[in-house]
């Protein structure tokens, strides 16, 4: 796969960034780890048990809510008035042993100047577990999780605006790394640089459309299928 589909600014166009915001799942680790497949399965199991419906219908609801509301949890909260905590605890009770330590990625993230944040639609507990297993947790100033966002998920604009306000971020100095292209639209509108980290996990219709792209959408400034290589190519001010 090529590094980019279109003529875009060189990676060193990010050299002045001082806030580095990373999505978690399928961004900081490769989708081939199949970690999110565990979460995906447990979502269906939880819905089937809590709503008392057959598993195939539970899976249908899971995917339908994901597409309609941004996350399955948002749909369960809005349609079924379900409390979020039991869902988050259950779906994130997974085996992290499949995750490798990533010393090369650690090296590249560690050299990024300024602040580093994780911004996830998952729980803080999940993010801490994953980043810890990867050997990256101590590199990040904070984790902005779904609870911190008032259970408003990406790509909702309110989630991004809340994160920016909470952490005092100047959007013009920030860059967002994401595997979901729709989650980069608002960062672009807010004035952030955006990087699509391409994933082999394509569970959303918008991701499926990526297969037919002949050029990158305007809201995606850079794309890569190798985060270590991309970060390693940055010419960083003060480094």
Regions found by a protein language model. Name each.
Residues 1-17, 110, 123-124, 128-239:
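Asp-based, Mg2+/Mn2+-dependent phosphohydrolase catalytic module
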Residues 30, 118-120, 196:
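Hydrophobic residues in well-ordered beta-strands that form the structural core
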Residues 8-22, 27-106, 125:
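N-terminal helical cap/lid subdomain that shapes the substrate entry/recognition surface
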Residues 32, 61-62, 115-116, 148, ...:
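A generic structural signal for short
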Residues 78-81, 112-116, 190-193:
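Short glycine/proline-enriched coil/turn segments at helix->beta-strand junctions
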